[in-house]
Amino acid sequence: MNSDKFYANLPVLENFVDITNGENFYPVPQDWAVIITDIADSTKAIETGKYKDVNLLGACSIIVILNLVGELEIPFVFGGDGASILIPPKFIPDAERALLAVQKMASEEFNLNLRIGIVPLEAIASNYDIRIAKLRISDNYTQAILRGGGISYATTLVKDKSTNSLYSPKLNHQYAIADFSGLECRWQDIPTRHEEILSLIVQVTAPSQTQIDNLYREVINQIDHIYGKGTECHPVVTENLQLAFQRKSLLSETRVFAAFQGRIKQTLYLWKLRLINLLGLVFMTFNIKTGSFNWGDYKQIVSEATDFKKFDDVLRMVISGKTKQRHKLTDYLEKKFQEGRLVYGFHVSDRALMTCLVFERDGRQVHFVDGADGGYALAAKQMKELMKS
C-alpha cells in the first residue's frame, strides 16, 4: 500500500493543548525516513554574529525538500539551527542530492558546516518510535507535532561521530541544483511589543507516558496563565512588521539565490529585493488589490502563519512578554527541575527574527520565528548544561 499521503490524510487538531493527548497521534509508516539537519558548532557561529545565516540555512533544508515533493504534504519542524523532516522512501535519492547541494552552498557561501543525515524509520523502531499529529495554526498552515522519542534519537545518530557516517549522504561530484523557490528573508528583525522575547525549550523527564502528557499539559497551561492566551504573547504582531531595505538584512537571502554567481550578480539580486520590498510597502500601505488579494491583509496573514509554538519531542516556544513574567515561569520550571520532572533552557532577546516559506501570498505559507542573537540554539545549549548538572 502506498504510504505517500499518510500525513496529508491525518485529521487536524484545533487546540495546542491537544498535543498532550496520546490518542491524537499516529505512527509514521515504517518505510519512511527522517531527515535531520543542523549547523555544527552553531554556538560559535552565533558568537560571530551569524545567527540569521544559521536560521536561514535551517529553513533552506526544509524548502528544498518541500519543492522536491511538490504538492505532497509532508511533516517538518524548524529547530532554529536545523530541521526535522519526514519523507516517503521514493524521495530519498533526490533528497540526498538536494541536501548535499545545500551543504555545499552553506560551506562555500556562508562558511558554515550544515550537518545532514537521513535515518530510516527501521533504524529507530527497535529503540523508539515516531508518532505524529497535525495542528492547525492558520487557514494557510498546519504544523506537524512529533513525539515518541524517535526524532531525538535520530538527531543523536546524526550528530554522534561514531554513527554519523551511517546516515550521511555520500559525497559525490554531481550536485543537484537545489530549488529554493519560496524562501524569503525580507523582514526587519521584529522588536518585542512588551519587554523581551523569550525562546524556550522544555523537555519532560517523567517515567511514564501518562505522567509526561500530564506535565506537558500543566506546563502549557502555566504558560497560558502567566503570559495570556491568544495573541497576547505572540512575538509577531502586524504593527511591528517592517520590510527590510538595508543590505545586512537582505544579504542572507541574496547569498542563497545568487550563490556562486559573483559579486555583480549578488548586487543585482540585492537591488531586486529592495525594489520588490518597495512595491510591497506601497501595496500594503494603500491596500492595493492584485486579483482578489488585498495586500493590506498580508501582515495579518504572516502573523497568523508563524510557528511560534511547536513540539518535536520537546516543547519549543518563542514568547513576547515582560521580565517579571519570565521570572514567574522560570521559578515554576526550576521547581519542576529540582523535583526531577523536567529540564529546560531559555534565551532572552529584545527582538525576534523570521525566515519565510511562501508558496502563495494568499495561501500556503509558513513563517519560522526565533529569538534574535541565539534563540533556540542557545536555549538548547543551556538545557544540555542543565542536564549535566
Language-model-detected regions and their locations in the chain:
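Regulatory and interdomain segments flanking nucleotide-handling catalytic cores
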Residues: 1-389
